[in-house]
Amino acid sequence: MEQGAEDIPVVYLHDIKRQYSQGEATLTILDGAKLALWAGQSVALVAPSGSGKSTLLHIAGLLEHPDEGEVYVSGAATSALTDAERTQIRRTDIGFVYQSHRLLPEFTALENVMLPQMIRGLKRKETISRSKEILSYLGLADRITHRPSELSGGEQQRVAIARAVANAPRVLFADEPTGNLDPHTADYVFNALMQLVKATQVAMLIATHNMELAARMDRRVSLQDGVVVELE
């Protein structure tokens, strides 16, 4: 990508190819996939199970290497980066939310949100203040001392969202974030994500089967034969 371009996507996938061995066969999951994610824009990735949604998210989030192609973050190529450099980008620029909240059970809601900030090297006083602010924004001000087992499914997922945005990432990836929730709770969690996108101008890519939620996002894309296609 040209560094001098006026508008540069937060993340840009260029000609991504990813294959896996399946016995003696080779399974091609992504084959020349391209996708640009822009600041303040929400994108729904809607595709059948096994089509490569999670693989695409993992490659875009620098959790997995493509076999071919390039992942650009803020205009900079990442293929030649060391594992340590990729980890640093994930800590500062990328947030993840999964279908399962993946909160640490021995920590309170507040401590779970503080953790990524502490790992980044921020001072404890600062992390406490910011974590309380985010949890309050997500309607959890009275739940900060509760451990995950003491929270409802929707509350657990909102804590997971708070943790994902704790370091003010530039892009947020969510893999079926409402998949384990009832419709009412799913709607509440989805609205929380959308509010954060608009408030912080983070770019967001959500893999989802929920067409109703996908329809409320800025863009909708799918995977067909390993290629990203725009949907109406």
Curated annotation (Swiss-Prot):
It comes from Rhodopseudomonas palustris (strain ATCC BAA-98 / CGA009). InterPro entries: AAA+_ATPase, ABC_transporter-like_ATP-bd, ABC_transporter-like_CS, ABC_transpr_LolD-like, MacB-like_ATP-bd, P-loop_NTPase. It is a peripheral membrane protein. Transmembrane segments: none annotated. It is found in: Cell inner membrane. CDD domains: ABC_MJ0796_LolCDE_FtsE. Residues 11-231 form the ABC transporter domain. Part of the ABC transporter complex LolCDE involved in the translocation of mature outer membrane-directed lipoproteins, from the inner membrane to the periplasmic chaperone, LolA. Responsible for the formation of the LolA-lipoprotein complex in an ATP-dependent manner. Belongs to the ABC transporter superfamily. Lipoprotein translocase (TC 3.A.1.125) family. ATP binds at residues 47-54. SMART domains: AAA (SM00382). PANTHER family: IMPORT ATP-BINDING PROTEIN, LIPOPROTEIN-RELEASING SYSTEM ATP-BINDING PROTEIN LOLD. Its EC number is 7.6.2.-. GO terms for cellular component: plasma membrane. Its main location: membrane. The complex is composed of two ATP-binding proteins (LolD) and two transmembrane proteins (LolC and LolE). This is Lipoprotein-releasing system ATP-binding protein LolD 2. The keyword Metal-binding does not apply. One of its GO terms (molecular function) is transmembrane transporter activity. One of its GO terms (biological process) is protein localization to outer membrane. The keyword Zinc-finger does not apply. Keywords: ATP-binding, Cell inner membrane, Cell membrane, Membrane, Nucleotide-binding, Translocase, Transport. It holds the Pfam family ABC_tran.
